[in-house]
Amino acid sequence: LEGGESSVKATKERLGGEALSADFWQQLRDQQHGFFSLNEGQALWRLSLPPHTPALELAVDESDIFYDWGGSQRWVKTALPADTLRDACQKAGGHATCYTPHAQGGAESPFTPLNAVVEKYHRNLKAELDAHGIFNPGRLYAAF
């Protein structure tokens, strides 16, 4: 909960429950929480979605999904192909980033491929800021 002190207090009293320790939030931030332990063949994905997006139709056990930011950010542990996750996110107006690309062979970028217009802007910006292509070549996208 966040907001003014009296608003947070009133909402907390209405909702009930117990406050979580700062350790929980730090473990979550640093991906040290037990949720982030992967099984053989699983990759860790961060799905970024518009607020109020309902559950995506994915063949993933609910225990392998961690909802954050009111559901706008979802951590998913799965062996599903990258295209399956990215297509589902795109249909919902979001995108997916793989945090463990080595788990999927590391052959592709962890980031959602750019459409032609956005890629043009990326290339032009990179050309302006890094004319000699020395800063992290291929780091975000293999093509530049």
Across the structure, where does each feature detected by a protein language model lie?
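A conserved active-site cap/scaffold subdomain adjacent to cofactor or substrate pockets
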Residues: L1-D23
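Conserved glycine-rich FAD pyrophosphate-binding loop
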Residues: G17-F144
